[in-house]
Amino acid sequence: MSDSDSVRPGGAMNGTAERLDPTINAMTSAYDQATVVLHLERYRLAAEYVSGADVVDCACGTGYGSEILAQAGARSVQGVDLDRDALAFARLQHAHPAVTYYEADAIRYVPKPMPSVWVSLETLEHLPRPVEYVAHVASVLPPGGRFIVSVPVTVSTDGNRHHLTDFTRESLRGLLKRYGFAEERKLEQSHHFALSDVMGVSRGPRQRDRRRGLIRWYVRHPQVLWQRIKLTLTKGFVNEYLTVVAVKA
């Protein structure tokens, strides 16, 4: 067994797209391959803003994005996550002289050095207190600092048990504005899927993401069911995402 085998994604990282890594995940379906492309596009956008900067990559997961940011010329990258297994993998597979990985809570993490760029891709929807998190980021970044953030902007809490909050374009922008961020740039992404992708989730890397007992869950959350029906009738089977580069006033 090699060192990389000993920390190969297991536990929370095994059988979930929430801990994907383009270097190791067996993304065999077109849907899963598209998932990787979308994640990489977001990090490549963020990479355009990090040259010479001290950067936080919050919810860094397996660290592939932190490495991308370092390779783009960041002076330092603090990769932050709560998943100890993911961080162990990151330290081995995505080590870089400019990157340090920390096990920490996103809302309580106090970076050193203080960053001028805070990257937070597909994070807010997972947090029990996303408003508190944005307030924390705003308290850390200096005037002119950038908060690069992405969320799903179509309903996702029904299909993914790890998602706690559904955002819209308006709700994300309103939250950023509330804490003094002005939108500088955006990236809109669409991820179309077929019913067979949903039915085949048990065989793919998303098997641990799906919400079991969905009918009972819809009974408790009828507004989400209505949002899902409306989305499907108007746009078909699609997930949409918004990435915003926001500047602190």
Region spans (language model):
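A short His-aromatic
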Residues: 122-126
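Short "lid" loop at the C-terminus of a central beta-strand within the Rossmann-like core
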Residues: 152-157, 189-193
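Conserved N-terminal segment of class I S-adenosyl-L-methionine
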Residues: 1-113, 117, 121, 131-134, ...
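Short secondary-structure junctions
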Residues: 182-185
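Conserved beta-strand signature within the Rossmann-like core of class I S-adenosyl-L-methionine
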Residues: 145-151
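Short, solvent-exposed loop/turn segments at secondary-structure boundaries
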Residues: 159-164
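A short glycine-rich, Lys/Arg-flanked "PGG" loop and its adjoining helix->strand segment in the class I
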Residues: 132-143
